[in-house]
A protein has these predicted regions:
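Hydrophobic alpha-helical segments at protein termini of multi-pass membrane proteins
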Residues: 1-238
Length: 238
């Protein structure tokens, strides 16, 4: 028998590692640890909140309950996953930052958004890994792809959220981008995987998985650039 704490640890460690990573990136002017813990724990609440958005969409038929076609896969990816999940995260981020006196630098928006996003990803990972017969395989694949994906969506959300906060003249545009950019990237990520599930073509599956791998590299590169632009010493470059 495998001790329960092993699957649990394997599910949580990727999120913890990325939380430490973003904290280290902000080491020149770090946020209070208790604030980051609060943001991460509140991020966990974005899972039930996202279900409050996705369930009605499924109930009225906008999001199919099962996927049979490419169209179904795309609708589930964008409307059943990316839209409700990123909306829920943005709402939690707004709660965290609306009266936060520590939100005084552009990098802070990224740090808090990543904490919220990894709170979501941590619980989601636990739900996927715990109880799965192949928990080691699931934990490994999600540690490489899914959790870093949520990290990247959080970086972009925080990047634009900070611009909206510190550039009042373009607030509406940047706030719109704070939700549009994560939804598009999250939707593309899920759509590729969901299309692989429904296709019967082995060649298409291979091509899509190659595209998926390249897209994951693109995601990480984009997130890394966003972090560099918002680091305190680089503010003038944005």
């Amino acid at each position: 028998l495998i001790p329960m704490y092993l699957p649990l640890l394997s599910a949580l460690i990727p999120a913890i590692v990325l939380l430490v990573y973003i904290y280290w990136q902000d080491r020149q002017s770090p946020e209070p640890v208790w604030q980051l813990i609060k943001a991460t724990l509140l991020g966990v609440l974005s899972i039930p909140l996202s279900l409050c958005i996705s369930s009605p969409l499924q109930a009225i038929g906008i999001v199919p309950e099962e996927m049979f076609t490419f169209g179904d896969a795309i609708r589930v990816a964008f409307l059943g996953a990316a839209l409700p999940e990123e909306l829920a995260k943005l709402f939690i981020l707004w709660l965290v930052l609306r009266k936060n006196r520590f939100f005084d630098e552009r990098m802070d928006g990224i740090v808090y958004a990543v904490c919220v996003s990894l709170g979501f990803a941590g619980l989601e990972n636990v739900l996927y890994v715990i109880g799965d017969a192949d928990w080691m395989g699931v934990a490994l694949s999600r540690a490489i792809f899914a959790v870093p994906g949520h990290f990247c969506y959080g970086v972009l959300m925080g990047y634009f959220y900070s611009l909206a906060h510190f550039c009042p003249s373009k607030r509406s545009y940047y706030m719109a981008m704070a939700i549009i950019a994560p939804i598009i990237l999250h939707g593309i990520y899920d759509a590729i995987l969901f299309i692989v599930r429904v296709t019967i073509s082995e060649w298409l599956s291979v091509i899509l998985m190659l595209i998926f791998t390249l897209f994951c590299f693109y995601l990480w590169k984009t997130a890394s650039k966003a972090i560099k632009k918002h680091l305190p010493s680089r503010d003038a470059m944005v």
